[in-house]
């Protein structure tokens, strides 16, 4: 439930099907050209990234999205989460999500809000 004290730290979103979200997040795992999952203005030499983990899980009253990769592009996670949520809302098809992940065509260019997004660990 909404709390003004948490508003800066979480994005309030209605409950969704975590099983389906994980199925969709599984499409991101592996080596991918994520050119349609980055904002312009980054200084990356390449948009190729390897995603090791992309999953969603429940923790207390929260739904957590967890990504682990060999690097991230500017806006990548916010675009990825927004795209998954659009499929869950029925505003984008699973096929369109797959095509965007396969760098064939961009269907979603909207970002999920930054509230609650944080980098938890850097591994070398």
What is the predicted function of each stretch?
Residues 1-124:
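Structured-RNA-binding interfaces characteristic of tRNA pseudouridine synthases
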């Amino acid at each position: 439930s909404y709390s003004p004290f948490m508003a800066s730290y979480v994005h309030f979103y209605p409950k969704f099907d975590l099983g389906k979200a994980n199925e969709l997040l599984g499409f991101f795992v592996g080596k991918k050209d994520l050119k349609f999952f980055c904002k312009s203005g980054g200084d990356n030499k390449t948009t190729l990234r390897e995603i090791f983990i992309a999953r969603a899980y429940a923790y207390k009253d929260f739904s957590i999205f967890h990504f682990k990769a060999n690097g991230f592009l500017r806006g990548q996670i916010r675009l990825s989460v927004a795209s998954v949520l659009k499929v869950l809302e029925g505003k984008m098809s699973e096929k369109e999500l797959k095509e965007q992940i396969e760098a064939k065509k961009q269907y979603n260019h909207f970002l999920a809000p930054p509230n609650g997004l944080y980098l938890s660990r850097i591994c070398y």
